[in-house]
């Protein structure tokens, strides 16, 4: 007998919001279009997920299910109903339920989460309500946000990272937001490959009519602007590059279930790259390019110091 609570992975006391969030996650996981090699099982699971949501999201139907199980919904348990009248529930098509929740938008596109991005950005604000500025800004763990909760265990239709012997290659897509919040999008295409046991990560972005590409393997290897090596940008990026990982205790977690995040500040692009070791890319909030002026002042200060030393 199918347990609808188990199908959605929720407790019996789950709230309507929990039910809807769980449906989004599991429905994306078992959507037949995402499982072409296992379509028969995916269709069965997808149908079960839709049925579970239809029952548990409705107060009356959920109450009948809790008391009499699925038989009560099918009418087979009618003799056990309080009012002794027959109650038969007809399930809708799984695709119709899916469209009701996700709308007509592409379910495997990051645009699916646009409506929840404002909440994601708000979650990274300070307690006083103002957003942090500059390199010290707080970047939230996006996968903890309800709208993106499904991304932690599987992607949204893009290929998962797989190492193919000594060389493996895959590509992912993500969005960067500038400091205005929702207004301007910068397309980012990170990719990764393994060469001789070393992880080589490449990130490309097109902004202000310039294509910028950075390649690194924990140490920056190259920085290109419009496919041409740029020594100044390379030096700046090396100087301003830093990594920030979430708290991790080896005594309480294993490396297999702990996600480590890397924050790389790139003020030349006005963008902070946020990556983690389990998933190559997630949403990242951009910074204003005020850091560029700071670096310019810093360089001028260094030149003055050198000039003073020569004079002495």
Swiss-Prot record:
InterPro entries tied to this protein: DnaJ_domain, DnaJ_domain_CS, DNJB2/6-like, J_dom_sf
Residue ranges of the region described as Disordered: 272-312
Alphabetical keyword list: Chaperone
Ranges in a coiled coil: none
Biological processes per GO annotation: chaperone-mediated protein folding
Keyword Disulfide bond: no
Transmembrane segments annotated in the record for this chain: none
Database matches in SMART domains: DnaJ
Composition-biased stretches (Basic residues): 291-312
Domain J, residue spans: 3-69
Any one GO molecular-function label of the UniProt entry: unfolded protein binding
A Pfam match: DnaJ
Top-level taxon of origin: Eukaryota
Function: Probably acts as a co-chaperone.
PANTHER family, per the entry: DNAJ HOMOLOG SUBFAMILY B MEMBER 2 (PTHR45168), SIMILAR TO DNAJ HOMOLOG SUBFAMILY B MEMBER 6 (HEAT SHOCK PROTEIN J2) (HSJ-2) (MRJ) (MDJ4) (PTHR45168:SF4)
Protein name, as recorded: DnaJ homolog subfamily B member 7
